[in-house]
Amino acid sequence: MQKDYQKLIVYLCDFLEKEVQKKGFKKVVYGLSGGLDSAVVGVLCQKVFKENAHALLMPSSASMPENKTDALSLCKKFSISYTEYSIAPYDAIFGSHFKDASLTRKGNFCARLRMAFLYDYSLKSDSLVIGTSNKSERMLGYGTLFGDLACAINPIGELFKTEVYELARRLNIPKKILNKPPSADLFVGQSDEKDLGYPYSVIDPLLKDIEALFKNKPIDTETLTQLGYDEILVKNITSRIQKNAFKLELPTIAQKFNPK
């Protein structure tokens, strides 16, 4: 069913206002990378909280300079308050101590550094941390646990990446941000498509069918291939979903021990 994106904007703004108020906060903070998802969240937060919304720009030593430029341009266009904290000195220390660390380890370390900066700012300013992960990323587990997935509330967590693009157009996000390849900007040359093997335009229809057909049920790959999806695509995507499902769950806590 086609979404009414203007109504969606009103709904998400209402969600942000009510949930932040419900948790006893007046101010919010979020990470702004220069990418699409954080730009959308930033503009939504600015609409609702105005001067009580604040963005943190946290480039690493591997961040592309144009991403910072795009983030600053967004801040200027929408009058977004921001602070820049470079995490480059800290990821350099990690690199010097763990010279054999894989790109994934380095990327996860940077994501968790950013989380630490966000929550430190949250405490200092009495602000609530707002998440920027979309539904495609969440279903695929394409994020860092206690890193970029960490937040108090997330306005776009139920929107697939292709839907975030449509929402961004309605919010007048700059075309430079809209048109660049999605990337977590965790290491040089990284892109979502390289990591996932497919563009979101291919992945999202499959994710939508998986959610519609197999919610709270085991995924039947044969059913999906019968719908016309490529067998390798189905195998790769379902494998990711199953392997990373734990990232969407709260920690499992042992029940209270009652000796008989």
From Swiss-Prot:
In terms of CDD domains, this protein maps to: NAD_synthase
Record flagged with keyword NAD: yes
Gene Ontology molecular function terms on file: ATP binding; glutaminase activity; metal ion binding; NAD+ synthase (glutamine-hydrolyzing) activity; NAD+ synthase activity
- Residues the record lists as binding Mg(2+): D37, E137
Binding annotation for ATP: G31, L32, S33, G34, G35, L36, D37, S38, T132, K161, S183
Q: Which SUPFAM superfamilies has this protein been placed in?
A: Adenine nucleotide alpha hydrolases-like
| Reaction catalysis annotation | deamido-NAD(+) + NH4(+) + ATP = AMP + diphosphate + NAD(+) + H(+)
Keywords (alphabetical) are:
ATP-binding, Ligase, Magnesium, Metal-binding, NAD, Nucleotide-binding
Membrane-spanning segments = none
Q: In which pathway does it act?
A: Cofactor biosynthesis; NAD(+) biosynthesis; NAD(+) from deamido-NAD(+) (ammonia route): step 1/1
GO cellular component assignments: cytoplasm
- InterPro entries given for it? NAD/GMP_synthase, NAD_synthase, NH(3)-dep_NAD(+)_synth, Rossmann-like_a/b/a_fold
Gene Ontology annotations of biological process type = NAD biosynthetic process
Positions that bind deamido-NAD(+): R112
Q: Which PANTHER family match?
A: GLUTAMINE-DEPENDENT NAD(+) SYNTHETASE, NH 3 /GLUTAMINE-DEPENDENT NAD + SYNTHETASE
Describe the protein's quaternary organization and the partners it interacts with: Homodimer.
| Free-text function comment from the UniProt entry | Catalyzes the ATP-dependent amidation of deamido-NAD to form NAD. Uses ammonia as a nitrogen source.
Q: What protein family is recorded?
A: Belongs to the NAD synthetase family.
Q: What is this protein called?
A: NH(3)-dependent NAD(+) synthetase
Q: Which organism is it from?
A: Helicobacter pylori (strain HPAG1)
Lineage per the UniProt record? Bacteria, Pseudomonadati, Campylobacterota, Epsilonproteobacteria, Campylobacterales
Whichever gene encodes this chain, its name is nadE
